[in-house]
Amino acid sequence: MRLKRIVAVLCLTLFPVIRGAAKTSDTSVKSAVENVLRQQETAWNRRDLDGFMTGYWNSPDLTFFSGAKLTSGWQATLERYRKTYQSEGHDMGKLEFSDLRIDPLGPDGAFVRGAWRLTMPDGKTPHGLFTLIFKKFSDGWKIVHDHTSAAE
């Protein structure tokens, strides 16, 4: 009977501590991932595409889905962005992410949903939704998969 009491007391004492640690970990994951996205916004709005791309995993295994097309790899993703937003006759506009929902998938993974909007110099506002998978690496949190759609 005494052993049961000890186990019960330990459970009642440790459960809130463990649960609190998990919440703290979730909060730090959410904060770190949101920070990457805010840094991407800032870089984009400076027209710094290389800076924007630091939020992505620099690997041939990065995947980017958009417009029913798969782009594989960091370099190909950078080239896609350059062609779409920095080639002649194109403008990057002002980027804003909103409606972020960041769900930690443990201490080194996160699933992110959100909305994006560009405000272009001509007043147009292309926009859409995205889902991202983030992974924590030794050099920080990086997007390993991006699925972005545009409103029709």
State the predicted function of each range.
Residues 1-7:
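Bacterial N-terminal signal peptides that target proteins for export
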Residues 88-91, 118-126:
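Short, cysteine-centered beta-strand-loop-beta hairpins and adjacent loop/turn segments enriched
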